[in-house]
């Protein structure tokens, strides 16, 4: 499912002491670990995020590193537990890490979920069950999406609706999708793209 609870997995460290190293932290969970570590979806997440925001705004996930706590003990920070954002200038000059807007943050979190959804559909589309790369989706019956990225402008919102519709139509399994929204434009585009024989308004 994608809703407000999905966004709660992500929170900001604003580096209040130095105001330099601003980063979005990811709470430890199986969901992002599978997407980022096991499936290597970082490039796809970046691609989706830049599509809906700015092609120069680049997310960078951390590698594992060690820091000292107040008692001088080593603390290991796991890989893919933090992400920093910068604007790429097209040269070798290092870019300052920036804190993105709330709307951009929602787009990033949606991009993580969307990449997982793409991978899930791809896995379930395999006809021969013995050839599945993972069996953790075998019992999955429903995907629930609640008002994805409501802060997008109309053009990007239309693009988002079209992309979701194409992804749903690509599913060859018995997976069912429940999508809720308060946005009439998003609903109309999604409904028209999928076709009224394949979806219902509740």
Task: Outline where the language-model segments fall.
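Short coil/turn segments at secondary-structure boundaries
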Residues: 13-16, 191-192
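Generic preference for hydrophobic/aromatic residues in regular secondary structure cores
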Residues: 4, 57-59, 199-202
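Extended helical coiled-coil dimerization/tether regions that scaffold
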Residues: 15, 19-105, 112-142
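Glycine/alanine-rich phosphate-binding loops at beta-alpha junctions
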Residues: 5, 10-14
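Switch/communication elements of ASCE P-loop NTPase nucleotide-binding domains
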Residues: 97-202
């Amino acid at each position: 499912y994608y809703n407000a609870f999905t966004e709660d997995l992500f929170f900001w460290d604003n580096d209040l002491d130095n105001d330099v190293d601003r980063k979005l932290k990811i709470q430890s969970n199986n969901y992002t670990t599978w997407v980022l570590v096991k499936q290597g979806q970082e490039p796809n997440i970046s691609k989706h995020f830049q599509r809906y925001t700015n092609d120069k705004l680049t997310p960078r996930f951390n590698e594992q590193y060690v820091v000292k706590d107040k008692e001088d003990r080593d603390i290991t920070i796991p890989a893919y537990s933090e992400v920093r954002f910068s604007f790429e200038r097209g040269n070798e000059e290092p870019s300052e890490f920036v804190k993105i807007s709330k709307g951009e943050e929602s787009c990033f979190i949606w991009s993580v979920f969307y990449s997982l959804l793409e991978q899930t559909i791809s896995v379930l589309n395999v006809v021969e069950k013995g050839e599945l790369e993972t069996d953790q989706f075998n019992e999955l019956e429903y995907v629930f999406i609640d008002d994805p990225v409501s802060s997008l402008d109309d053009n990007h919102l239309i693009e988002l609706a079209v992309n979701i519709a194409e992804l749903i139509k690509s599913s060859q399994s018995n997976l069912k999708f429940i999508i809720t929204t308060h946005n009439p434009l998003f609903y109309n585009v999604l409904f028209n793209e999928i076709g009224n024989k394949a979806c219902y308004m509740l």
